[in-house]
UniProtKB/Swiss-Prot annotation:
Catalytic reaction list: a (3R)-hydroxyacyl-[ACP] = a (2E)-enoyl-[ACP] + H2O
Family (UniProt): Belongs to the thioester dehydratase family. FabZ subfamily.
Keyword annotations of the record: Cytoplasm, Lipid A biosynthesis, Lipid biosynthesis, Lipid metabolism, Lyase
Location, primary (coarse class): cytoplasm
Protein known as: 3-hydroxyacyl-[acyl-carrier-protein] dehydratase FabZ
GO cellular component: cytoplasm; membrane
CDD domains noted in UniProt: FabZ
Known EC number: 4.2.1.59
Compartment(s): Cytoplasm
PANTHER family: 3-HYDROXYACYL-[ACYL-CARRIER-PROTEIN] DEHYDRATASE
Top-rank EC class of the record's enzyme: lyase
Cited function: Involved in unsaturated fatty acids biosynthesis. Catalyzes the dehydration of short chain beta-hydroxyacyl-ACPs and long chain saturated and unsaturated beta-hydroxyacyl-ACPs.
């Protein structure tokens, strides 16, 4: 549905911090499904951990937030703005994410009032849940 070029028109993030490769499904302001292809070339793997590369959990959370931001920032009312973390609740990591994995990230917007919102995000590798969290966000000006 959205390739990397379209994603870069919506999100301000760039390499090495753009953690969304493709959007597969989207209902603006409601629900979104995106992909992060995890490769051996990720800049964090040499240090996390040498000889045993694991994607840091905080970056899995960040990838979930970026996918969710696409659904919000695609709305005409929020176009050209930026989504910022306002909180993270109930974060759980269920499996390690390693080079070669494809993260399928599903985000459902639970609440959006003005410039403050809450979403439920889940990241899967195949059919296995890798991580989940409730993400609170604020929409700001760039």
């Amino acid at each position: 549905m959205l390739d990397i070029n379209a994603i870069q028109q919506i999100l301000p993030h760039r390499y090495p911090f753009l953690l969304v490769d493709r959007i597969l499904e989207m209902e603006e302001g409601k629900r979104v499904v995106g992909i992060k292809n995890v490769t051996a070339n990720e800049p964090f793997f040499p240090g996390h951990f040498p000889g045993y590369p694991v994607m840091p959990g905080v970056l899995v959370i960040e990838a979930m937030a970026q996918v969710g931001a696409v659904a919000i920032l695609s709305m005409p009312a929020y176009a050209g703005r930026i989504a910022l973390f306002a909180g993270i609740d109930k974060a759980r990591f269920r499996r390690q994410v390693v080079p070669g994995d494809t993260l399928r990230i599903e985000v459902e917007v639970l609440k959006l009032r003005g410039t403050i919102g809450k979403s439920m995000a889940r990241a899967y590798v195949g059919e296995e849940l890798a991580a989940e969290a409730e993400l609170m966000f604020a929409i700001g000006q760039k």
